[in-house]
Design a protein with these regions (language model features):
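Anionic ligand-binding catalytic core segments
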Residues: 1-142, 146-203
Length: 203
């Protein structure tokens, strides 16, 4: 059964009920969508993901449940998202700082800078970006990627918050980050169709 975390207790799960925002389409399916997308990432594409599942309230409303990968035996590992690692906050990056700053190329440079086994994690990151593109997840912003301290070194964290956002947004985008794949930005107008060549160059 589920219960609230008590004062002084380190929670090990995160529960996400259906969002209350009325501008989101098909709100009742958000939990199932995220669970399915995460399962496809893990089982079909071999992407390391946070453990997750669906649970239901007494009124049969679905909620998404995920296990925190930064907590083990009641102790929290150090984790930093890419917005923090790149130095972006609301104060210096604007209200949409996690979307309008940086690119996925610059995210890869963060991995190169902080991760000892950078080549391995950059490959994992590349595969995750490709998956986000083909699964129509345009919520892959800077705070949805993290490095986690596993022992005495940092590594790319398991993937989390993967969801097909095209089912819930009136105007979904190709990429969550305004610059897209490259630090110099991309032409994402109607005349440019993002495809294999873009990802080959990114790789």
């Amino acid at each position: 059964y589920l219960r609230y975390t008590q004062e002084g207790e380190q929670g090990t799960y995160i529960l996400k009920p259906c969002p209350s925002s009325y501008h989101i389409l098909n709100r009742d399916y958000c939990a199932a969508n995220e669970h399915l997308t995460m399962q496809i990432a893990a089982q079909v594409y071999g992407i390391e993901t946070a453990a997750n599942g669906l649970c239901f309230f007494n009124n049969d409303e679905a909620a998404y449940l995920t296990r925190r990968f930064d907590v083990h035996d009641g102790k929290k590992s150090q984790q930093e998202d890419f917005a923090a690692l790149m130095g972006y906050t609301k104060a210096n990056g604007g209200s949409d700082y996690k979307y309008c700053n940086g690119s996925y190329e610059e995210c890869a440079e963060v991995i190169q800078k902080y991760v000892k086994a950078a080549r391995i994690d950059i490959l994992r990151f590349f595969r995750l970006i490709v998956f986000n593109f083909i699964s129509l997840n345009d919520d892959a912003h800077l705070k949805n990627f993290s490095l986690i301290n596993s022992g005495d070194e940092y590594r790319l964290s398991p993937a989390y918050n993967l969801i097909n956002t095209s089912l819930h947004l009136t105007e979904p985008r190709r990429f969550a980050l305004d610059k897209g794949l490259f630090k110099e930005g991309m032409n994402l107008g109607d005349t440019h169709r993002v495809g294999r060549k873009d990802f080959e160059e990114f790789g």
